[in-house]
A protein has these predicted regions:
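Residue-level recognition of strand-loop junctions within catalytic nucleotide-signaling folds
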Residues: 29-30, 60, 101-103, 146-148
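Short, solvent-exposed loop/turn elements at beta->coil junctions and helix N-caps
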Residues: 12-13, 87, 128-132
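Conserved core segment of the aminotransferase class I/II
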Residues: 2-72, 76-81, 162
Length: 162
């Protein structure tokens, strides 16, 4: 029953390291896809057909069954590099985001702390409060580890110095 009511909307961006291409997809039962297509045709006004053609070729040369292990290695590298920092890392699985508690570092709001990280240290993070309907601030932020290893190592080095 549930399968007949499910819609998957996703992006190829992080999985294939092509975030700037802005190419996504939707998967749903036929009766739902028929309705999605009615709306979609009016919401998408420009499609990068060259990027679509490149992706359709590229997707045949990558083993998507290895993506889990690929991102696990990235997560483990980033976590290991941050092990001597004052950030408290939360367990993360099935994602390319690492949530970190920064309460041992600052009492600033998560929004202000993220602004400071970007402005003063050149490391981007997203405040978790923006995902909460009540904007509750638990002094937690998230980092994306869908980056090349050198970027992760450099970012962790900066974060360890905070």
């Amino acid at each position: 029953k549930l399968m007949n009511r499910c819609v998957i909307a996703s992006s190829f961006g992080k999985s294939f390291h092509i975030t700037g291409w802005k190419i996504g997809y939707a998967v749903a039962p036929d009766h739902l896809m028929k309705e999605i297509k009615k709306v979609h045709q009016y919401n998408v006004f420009s499609v990068n057909s060259v990027a679509q053609a490149c992706l359709s070729e590229y997707i045949n040369h990558i083993d998507v069954t290895q993506l889990g292990q690929f991102y696990k290695q990235k997560r483990d590298l980033f976590a290991q590099q941050l092990s001597k920092s004052r950030f408290q890392l939360e367990v993360c699985e099935g994602t390319y985001f690492q949530v970190a508690d920064y309460s041992a570092i600052s009492s600033a709001s998560d929004v202000d702390f993220c602004k400071s990280l970007t402005t003063n240290h050149g490391v981007a993070a997203i405040p978790i409060s923006v995902f909460n309907s009540d904007l509750k601030d638990a002094k937690k932020i998230r980092f994306c580890f869908a980056k090349d290893d050198n970027t992760l190592i450099q970012a962790a080095k900066i974060l360890c110095g905070i």
